[in-house]
From Swiss-Prot:
Keywords: DNA replication, DNA-binding. It comes from Pseudomonas phage Pf3. The keyword DNA-binding applies. This is DNA-Binding protein G5P. InterPro entries: NA-bd_OB-fold, SS_DBP_Pseudomonas. One of its GO terms (molecular function) is DNA binding.
Length: 78
């Protein structure tokens, strides 16, 4: 399954308390049942160029809770 995500240039990078680097990037999820995109922060391995992408995803269940898992390596420009 694919979902459209529009990434912006807004990025937050840092180092965790354990010394691990992290990158969060702002994006907007385009859902079919919503008339407007939803603003989100995405944990990414590296900064993604701003723009709209079709991103494959799957739904996992972790400790009884559903979570979305995005495959940013397989995404394509929309």
């Amino acid at each position: 399954m694919n979902i459209q995500i529009t990434f912006t240039d807004s990025v937050r990078q840092g180092t965790s308390a354990k010394g691990n680097p992290y990158t969060f990037q702002e994006g907007f999820l385009h859902l079919e049942d919503k008339p407007f995109p939803l603003q989100c922060q995405f944990f990414v391995e590296s900064v993604i160029p701003a723009g709209s992408y079709q991103v494959p995803y799957r739904i996992n269940v972790n400790n009884g809770r559903p979570e979305l898992a995005f495959d940013f390596k397989a995404m394509k420009r929309a």
